[in-house]
A protein has these predicted regions:
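SAM-dependent transferase fold signal centered on methyltransferase-like domains
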Residues: 1-145
Length: 145
């Protein structure tokens, strides 16, 4: 089990439902916001449970081939509306298609052969200019006292 405040090196293997990167250190699963598949990161454990924990991204040691320099939207890391904006747009589409397909196979028990016949590729937005990023309509702004 990891300890709170421990600094670890993690290779990100998947992305969770909230857009957080998922990696393992000695079999222990960590969820790391702003990390994407293929990144090797240095992270600080913020919350440690028995079998998993949450960590804060400290440094990207080796960026994924799909990582962008900076998210297009200056509010991306603050508003919570575009969780995987650190990822290039074509990679976002491929990830989303893979996630839907995996859920249909695993949860819906739809055979892969059937999905090959009926499932179409994810349709993205027009990539001219900034169009892939002008259709979102969700924002989460935390407030406190």
């Amino acid at each position: 089990m990891m300890q709170k405040n421990e600094i670890v090196k993690v290779k990100i293997e998947d992305i969770g439902v909230g857009g957080e990167g998922i990696g393992k250190v000695d079999g222990y699963t960590l969820f790391i916001k702003d990390a994407i598949i293929g990144d090797v990161v240095e992270a600080k454990v913020m919350k440690a449970k028995k079998n998993y924990g949450y960590a804060r991204l400290m440094n990207v040691l080796t960026p994924s081939k799909d990582r962008v320099e900076e998210p297009v939207c200056p509010m991306a890391r603050k508003c919570g509306g575009c969780q995987i904006q650190e990822m290039k747009y074509p990679a976002q589409l491929a990830f989303k298609e893979s996630k839907v397909r995996g859920n249909l196979e695993r949860i819906g028990e739809v055979p892969g052969e059937l999905l090959d016949q009926i499932m179409h590729p994810v349709v993205g937005m027009d990539e001219e200019g900034m169009q892939p990023f002008r259709y979102r309509n969700k924002a989460q702004f935390p407030s406190g006292t």
